[in-house]
């Protein structure tokens, strides 16, 4: 999500489209997450001029050299038209309408905007809702279902990070957070 937006603004500038279920949720996303990330990250603060009225930046669009981040609502067919994008971030897809007006599936409409780019990237995330009719569940079932694995610094065993293996003292967080290896049992 936001990490990819950061990477695209800083290292690999490109047109980015963030699609929220509604335009109102998009505005909230921009105000509560995107704007603070830009404000609090010095390198992004330099790239995205949020102060000048001539920069073209608004709550729903942030311009930077080589690209932009545009935030839209899945319920608005007009915002899905005529917009080539390289990176598509679809948030809370279980809350998307079945159709953007009479235009069709908002996810498919947004993905059509990526045809210009051979190296496009699509990120689809959501909190699952109703089992059996959850869009994110369907998307997950259609993937390879791979998990990111990290090596244990002690024995080298590769394993996914699981919450059950995170070790910390909730009464003294200054002691730090560690990960317990599922094979050797040592913490690092």
Q: Where is each model-derived feature located?
A:
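Phosphate/NTP-binding elements of NTP-utilizing enzymes
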Residues: 1-188
